[in-house]
Amino acid sequence: YHSADYGKTFTRIADDSKVWGFALSIKQDPTEPNLVFLGTEFGLYVSFDKAKTWNKWEHGYPKAVSTYDMTIQEREADLVIGTFGRAIYVLDDIRPLRAFAKNGGKAPVGKITAFPAPDAYQAEIQQPHGERFMASAKYAGENRVFGGRLSYLIQDEKEKLDSLTVKIYTASGEQIRTLKTLPSKGVNRIIWNLDRKSSAEMTGGWGGGQGGGIHLRHLRQV
């Protein structure tokens, strides 16, 4: 239920006609109030219109699992979900969902829309000693990929794109990387490894990384 008058009256926002299973948890986005997440006995739901309508979320999430608790990690804009029997799930970077909610559940205008990218950090990971061949003795979830995550929306229904070019610039305007990918309709995500474009002067070894002040400046369809 939802109250807009400090508890004097309540409006039911979820029932059997809208969601499947008992409601167990609910979380409203502190940045975009129209974006609301609902956890039920049988899955996760998302609303882009302040709980008026619900959409079942099944992208990388179990179709039927008790969704007991949720919180939003505001620095990373991640939705962290606690389930019963299926461990913890993290929905990385909900900024694209905020854009939909801000627009009343509709996609932003334009064939291609680039969403604000989260901060990315360069890190060198070393495997700890004694954990090389663990077989089935170790249970661990899969971490998200390293690098910069760039999200964009394709909503052209008539024309299918052969490829998409992403150009990355420094704060001073220097182009340092060009990425190409095969996009599909809807929200897409490409990972940049925080490296510069190759140089003919480099003769070997590992390529150097890139420091701060990086901006996604240009998307071009081909």
Regions found by a protein language model. Give the residues of each.
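Generic structural detector for well-ordered beta-strands
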Residues: K27, P116, S151-L153, K180, ...
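Contiguous beta-strand segments within globular domains
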Residues: E124-S163, Y169, R189-I191
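Glycine-centered tight-turn motifs at strand-turn-strand junctions
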Residues: Q175-H218
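Beta-propeller blade termini and top-face loops
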Residues: Y1-K138, V145-G148
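Short, glycine-anchored, charge-dense loop/turn motifs used at functional sites
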Residues: T170-E174, V222
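Short coil-to-beta strand junction motifs in C2/discoidin
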Residues: E159-L164, R217-Q221
